[in-house]
Swiss-Prot record:
It comes from Porphyromonas gingivalis. This is 29 kDa immunogenic protein.
């Protein structure tokens, strides 16, 4: 579950960029 959350966060950061 934690891994999935990390992936989502990373995706959000990349999208912001």
């Amino acid at each position: 579950a934690n891994e999935a959350k990390v992936v989502l966060v990373a995706d959000n950061v990349q999208g912001d960029n």
